[in-house]
Amino acid sequence: MRNEEFPTPIKDIINYENINYHILLQFNKEENNISLSINQENSSIKYEKLELNLQKLINFSKVFKMCESLNDAFTIFQNLFQSKKVGIQKITSNSIIIFLKVEILGKEQKFQKMNQN
């Protein structure tokens, strides 16, 4: 049985309407989830974390038919960030919509994940 490496946090900056947003994607082993936090640059505004629990991530990943585990789901997010296929589509006072573009079998499909309450 091989030991899976513990995923490292992903840090990135996404520009949306000429404002830079700092993105932090973290794997939380104890809570068995991946958290995504978005903070606006040069601002005291701290957006709530998007909490994606294990089951939601597995369901999400099954849409892509790429993985069955939390670690694989994290890898999908990591690849999306590194390939710049993630963008902030809409930000309001209490919601953030993350725009994901994933290429499957040469066809580009677009998915939206809506955040917390």
In which residue ranges do the predicted regions lie?
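A structural signal for beta-rich interaction modules in eukaryotic proteins
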Residues: M1-M114
